[in-house]
């Protein structure tokens, strides 16, 4: 967990403790978040590109591993 930012570690702790709800469709949750970042024109192009690349890699890995 040390390689992740403080906000991610906080949310992890909250989900693990039951304070926040766990989402069983973790891949769908991640893809929705990455899609939101990738389509937000207020963000820098490099941040949007990173989100799009990460989402595309997840989609490919999901289909390749089936």
UniProtKB/Swiss-Prot annotation:
InterPro entries: UPF0253 (IPR009624). Belongs to the UPF0253 family. This is UPF0253 protein ESA_03148.
């Amino acid at each position: 967990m040390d390689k992740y930012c403080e906000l991610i570690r906080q949310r992890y702790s909250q989900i693990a403790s039951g304070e926040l709800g766990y989402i069983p469709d973790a891949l769908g949750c991640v893809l929705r978040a990455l899609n939101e970042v990738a389509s937000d024109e207020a963000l820098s192009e490099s941040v949007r590109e990173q989100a799009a690349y990460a989402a595309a890699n997840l989609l490919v890995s999901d289909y390749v591993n089936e």
